[in-house]
Amino acid sequence: MANSRRVSRVSSLIKREVSQMLLHDIKDDRVGAGMVSVTEVDVSGDLQHATIFVSIYGSEQAQAETMEGLKSSTSFVRRELSHRMRLRRSPEVVFRQDHSLERGDRMVHLLNQIKDTIPEEEGITEEE
């Protein structure tokens, strides 16, 4: 079992490499249907499994197409990781869609709606 510092380093390295693959190496047109970015990579303690969280900007259909393209390219990503990284075994790769940015955006939108509906009280300004 790898120590937590090594797991963290491998995780950040996988994030960087997969981001580069998304930009330059994955040729599947479905992956280009939505704007994709790697938000986080969770690597198991034994470095055998990597869950790659991606944020996809686009319509629901574009997001679904992009996830299908990513799922079909997992073997390519795993093979490329084995070439680019010095690991005894290349981790099994699973792509998951990260909805946290969408939830955060929705939360900001709701807070702005609340702010607009509440009348400003006397003596209270936004500068405080």
Curated annotation (Swiss-Prot):
Main location: cytoplasm
Compartment list: Cytoplasm
InterPro entries cross-referenced by the UniProt entry: KH_dom-like_a/b, RbfA, RbfA_dom_sf, Ribosome-bd_factorA_CS
Pfam families referenced in this protein's UniProt entry, alphabetically: RBFA
Organism domain of life: Bacteria
An annotated GO cellular component: cytosol
Record-level GO BP terms: maturation of SSU-rRNA
Record-level Gene Ontology MF annotations: ribosomal small subunit binding
Record keywords: Cytoplasm, Ribosome biogenesis
NCBIfam families referenced in this protein's UniProt entry, alphabetically: rbfA
Chain's role: One of several proteins that assist in the late maturation steps of the functional core of the 30S ribosomal subunit. Associates with free 30S ribosomal subunits (but not with 30S subunits that are part of 70S ribosomes or polysomes). Required for efficient processing of 16S rRNA. May interact with the 5'-terminal helix region of 16S rRNA.
Subunit details: Monomer. Binds 30S ribosomal subunits, but not 50S ribosomal subunits or 70S ribosomes.
Family in the record: Belongs to the RbfA family.
Protein name: Ribosome-binding factor A
